[in-house]
């Protein structure tokens, strides 16, 4: 194994047994996390889950009450922020208003007493990387929000940190600019080859940019996986509901058909579902289906085959038609269908009776647990 291959597999950041309390309340408890070289990791969770506290402890802005933080195998638990090879981009960008763009980016290098002959080419390179070299002599107030964001990133990477931390860094941008910056951030991370740790509560941001996502709740990691694993294979109801929209059906196991499939009663209807849980007849489970995984079939009022309901709401969104159904039990189900203007049945009428189906194996089955 060559050095490059080895470094990519070794953790650049390693948190072990980290705990942190504020005013006597523990917000992080016995927290473990490894972040690999060159990885784009997103820490995702609702407000108050502890994600920003984790980021601030990695940066050195908060001190852990217990546990260790390693940076490239060196213990930095007690090392002050300015001595860690880690830089942070904040939500506010924190640019100096009286300095030019060039001076803002050069500030960290001058604080480190880097030779002036080296500063200019490094700052120019960083500005070229974010495609703003032509703005070098402007002041921050003369830039758009997206340009200020890119300057903050250039200032953070000019020091060549081992890890770049981004704390809700896109949340102040409008929707279109935020989408553009998501693409640019990922491209920049690939170009630099350094580790990015991004904190957000925005699921779409996490799914679109990350190599890996950890989902947090109450200071604990609920799931750690790739974006696809997090979305398609949630480990519990919290993760399933937090990442996108999902329908949760209560089901009762009737019998096991084979190693992969069971027959279960869902909404007074027998259905075959894929389930690798150790279950027996009579056990309660949850069957989860995303809105885009469900199919609708318009039926006559007299038809009662399968899971049926009535269209109560419909929303045209350009590419999709989103419908809300009310089942006989009163449960509301969300369905998202690709809009095909040539299909006479796609634009369902309010009050239309429909049957729900889905492709076998697209469902996720979880053990029965209390809704949170």
From Swiss-Prot:
Coiled coil (residue ranges): none
PROSITE patterns registered for this protein in UniProt: ABC_TRANSPORTER_1, ABC_TRANSPORTER_2, POTA
A single GO cellular-component term on record: ATP-binding cassette (ABC) transporter complex
Organism domain of life: Bacteria
Chain residues that bind ATP: 45-52
Annotated catalysed reactions: ATP + H2O + polyamine-[polyamine-binding protein]Side 1 = ADP + phosphate + polyamineSide 2 + [polyamine-binding protein]Side 1
Location in the cell: Cell inner membrane
Sorted UniProt keywords: ATP-binding, Cell inner membrane, Cell membrane, Membrane, Nucleotide-binding, Translocase, Transport
InterPro entries, per database record: AAA+_ATPase (IPR003593), ABC_SmlMolc_Importer (IPR050093), ABC_transporter-like_ATP-bd (IPR003439), ABC_transporter-like_CS (IPR017871), Mo/tungstate-bd_C_term_dom (IPR008995), P-loop_NTPase (IPR027417), PotA-like (IPR005893), PotA_ATP-bd (IPR017879)
The keyword Glycoprotein appears for this protein: no
SUPFAM superfamilies: MOP-like, P-loop containing nucleoside triphosphate hydrolases
Sequence intervals crossing the membrane: none
Entry's Gene Ontology molecular function annotations: ABC-type putrescine transporter activity; ATP binding; ATP hydrolysis activity
Subunit structure of this chain's protein: The complex is composed of two ATP-binding proteins (PotA), two transmembrane proteins (PotB and PotC) and a solute-binding protein (PotD).
Family per similarity comment: Belongs to the ABC transporter superfamily. Spermidine/putrescine importer (TC 3.A.1.11.1) family.
Function: Part of the ABC transporter complex PotABCD involved in spermidine/putrescine import. Responsible for energy coupling to the transport system.
Listed name of the protein: Spermidine/putrescine import ATP-binding protein PotA
Gene: potA
